[in-house]
């Protein structure tokens, strides 16, 4: 390919709407262009990158015996209603684009395809003799993001590989899950990415076990907690740790204390000589559920701990056997709307009476009471007395209403590791590029996808699902491989492997040697780009650095002697060598790395 025919338009200035380096560089380098909020066009070089990633993914999945398919992007609402996810995806998270056709039938644009693939499996997989089987597709997905940002990292339209496996028994599911994990490691390695597998929450997809694959990068939206021995890594949403040891509360009888202007734990401790580990704070929240219920919820945490909202949503869902659409703090305005008296915010205790909800209009008339283990493990503590400007010193759990024990706290860097208290957790940021799940029978039970087992009995299929964000992975590679001059693509996914730059297009000697080198690369099956533009050499060099081709061959003033300059993009090291040696150096490098 010649640059003069590539439709390459580069930018020197940083786009105003590009917040992170990878987004800035992909726009500046002529890889993507914004069409609308969260909607991008993949320009020719970006499409080459995506096709190379797709080829790597296909090779690894085909090696596992997976079968490629293509599923419809338009999905009937009926399937999602049967799985119980329609309301959550259209009202709760609200991430599914949905529409009504001319026959007034509800449809959704697929953000994922569990329902569709399960419906097909139930129709096609009738016997255990057909199992196991894994199907995958690579196609565009849609998410109605509240706040699209960071270019391809969080867009409203994106390319994804999603695979689904079906099994007759748990052992077989676990074997495929592990095989897929191994394949993912190879995929990310071949794409030139440093990725770490971490324990993760299953989220709206569901299932018993799941792992995320994170590309470590400062711009990552996720916080990863890891142990130094490499035995533990988890997304903070899922992570567990040993909390600091609580200081015992001084002996003494239970008593009321006046606490004016002490609505926070910090104020309470400062005014009364307390340590936060000696206190229990209570959050008053309202959970909105997919079955229509609105459940007032009291959450008790030790005073030094922070609430993990993902763990909370899971605990509420388990306790009430319903999916959580949203959980938010109860406000005074909401109390007025429910015809309820004002709550003593800032002084609420775990034993706030259900009578506080008496007469409410639409909420459940009792509290769901959840307590983190750090709070329940305190023998005596200070907490709100359910009266304005008053707290109770020396409370115990004995006289409290029953609490549902749950892990609700947020693990943090510096906490002791559960598996080895001598180690502490460290943190880094990551970009999620893949996620694998053991779904079990969640969807097959809901959609009645059954097979006949070896005993001749009907049984629901066991399932796994496995996703890779193709377009996100491409941008994550840039986030991990760039410098102040531009992108430095890993060799395996670079749009071109080498760029031959003619320093002075008016020099026939330079042009002839460059054309010879360019043709030699093409004849050797090497993806080469020839910069044949009538531009100053400095402009060409800047563009070459910006677009990030792994190898650059500059044909310049030494062309008459058959010499060229070889520049490796990742190191910026350059050498002047005979053109035959330059060709062989690039060829050998590509053969070694691919």
From Swiss-Prot:
It catalyses: tRNA(Pro) + L-proline + ATP = L-prolyl-tRNA(Pro) + AMP + diphosphate. GO terms for cellular component: cytosol. GO terms for biological process: prolyl-tRNA aminoacylation. Its EC number is 6.1.1.15. Its main location: cytoplasm. It is found in: Cytoplasm. GO terms for molecular function: aminoacyl-tRNA deacylase activity; ATP binding; proline-tRNA ligase activity. Consists of three domains: the N-terminal catalytic domain, the editing domain and the C-terminal anticodon-binding domain. PANTHER family: MITOCHONDRIAL RIBOSOME PROTEIN L39/PROLYL-TRNA LIGASE FAMILY MEMBER, PROLINE--TRNA LIGASE. Homodimer. Belongs to the class-II aminoacyl-tRNA synthetase family. ProS type 1 subfamily. This is Proline--tRNA ligase. It comes from Synechococcus sp. (strain WH7803).
């Amino acid at each position: 390919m010649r640059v003069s025919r590539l439709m390459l338009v580069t930018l020197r200035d940083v786009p105003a709407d590009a917040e992170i380096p990878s987004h800035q560089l992909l726009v500046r380098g002529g890889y993507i262009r914004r069409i609308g909020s969260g909607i991008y066009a993949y320009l020719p070089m970006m499409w080459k990158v995506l096709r190379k990633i797709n080829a790597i993914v296909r090779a690894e999945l085909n090696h596992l015996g997976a079968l490629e398919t293509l599923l419809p992007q338009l999905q009937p609402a009926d399937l999602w209603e049967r799985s119980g996810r329609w309301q959550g995806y259209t009202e709760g998270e609200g991430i599914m684009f949905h529409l009504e056709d001319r026959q007034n039938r509800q449809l959704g644009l697929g953000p994922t395809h569990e329902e569709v693939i399960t419906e097909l499996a139930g129709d096609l997989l009738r016997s255990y003799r057909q199992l196991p089987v894994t199907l995958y597709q690579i196609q565009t997905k849609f998410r109605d993001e509240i706040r699209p940002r960071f270019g391809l990292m969080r867009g409203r339209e994106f390319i994804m590989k999603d695979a689904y496996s079906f099994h007759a028994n748990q052992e077989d599911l676990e074997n495929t899950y592990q095989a897929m994990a191994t394949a993912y490691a190879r995929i990310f390695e071949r794409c030139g990415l440093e990725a770490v597998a971490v324990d993760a929450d299953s989220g709206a997809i569901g299932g018993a076990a799941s792992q995320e694959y994170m590309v470590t990068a400062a711009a990552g939206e996720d916080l990863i907690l890891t142990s130094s021995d490499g035995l533990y890594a988890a997304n903070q949403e899922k992570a567990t740790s040993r909390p600091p040891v609580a200081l015992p509360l001084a002996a003494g009888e239970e008593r009321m204390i006046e606490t004016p202007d002490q609505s926070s734990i910090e104020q309470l401790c400062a005014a009364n000589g307390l340590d936060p580990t000696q206190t229990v704070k209570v959050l008053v929240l309202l959970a909105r559920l997919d079955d229509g219920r609105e459940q007032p919820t009291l959450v008790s945490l030790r005073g030094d701990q922070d609430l993990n909202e993902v763990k909370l949503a899971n605990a509420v869902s388990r306790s009430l056997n319903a999916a959580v659409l949203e959980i938010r703090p109860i406000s005074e305005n909401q109390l007025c709307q429910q015809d309820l008296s004002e709550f003593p915010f800032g002084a609420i205790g775990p034993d706030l009476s259900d009578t506080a909800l008496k007469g409410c209009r639409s909420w459940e008339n009792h509290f769901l009471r959840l307590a983190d283990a750090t709070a329940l493990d305190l023998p005596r503590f200070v907490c709100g007395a359910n009266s304005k400007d008053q707290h109770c010193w020396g409370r115990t759990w004995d006289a409290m209403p029953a609490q549902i024990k749950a892990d609700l706290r947020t693990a943090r860097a510096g906490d002791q590791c559960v598996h080895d208290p001598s180690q502490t957790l460290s943190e880094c940021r990551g970009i999620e590029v893949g996620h694998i799940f053991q779904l079990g029978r969640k969807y097959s039970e809901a959609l009645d996808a059954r097979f006949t087992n070896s005993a001749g009995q009907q049984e629901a299929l066991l399932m796994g699902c496995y996703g890779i964000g193709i377009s996100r992975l491409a941008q994550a590679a840039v986030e991990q491989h760039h410098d102040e001059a531009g992108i430095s693509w890993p060799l395996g996914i670079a749009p071109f492997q080498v760029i031959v730059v003619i320093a002075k297009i008016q020099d026939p000697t330079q042009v002839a040697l460059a054309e010879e080198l360019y043709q030699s690369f093409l004849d050797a099956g090497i993806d080469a780009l020839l910069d044949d533009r009538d531009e100053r050499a400095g402009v060409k060099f800047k563009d070459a650095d910006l677009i990030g081709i792994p190898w650059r061959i500059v044909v310049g003033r030494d062309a008459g002697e058959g010499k060229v300059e070889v520049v490796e993009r990742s190191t910026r090291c350059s050498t002047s060598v005979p053109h035959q040696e330059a060709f062989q150096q690039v060829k050998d490098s590509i053969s070694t790395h691919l």
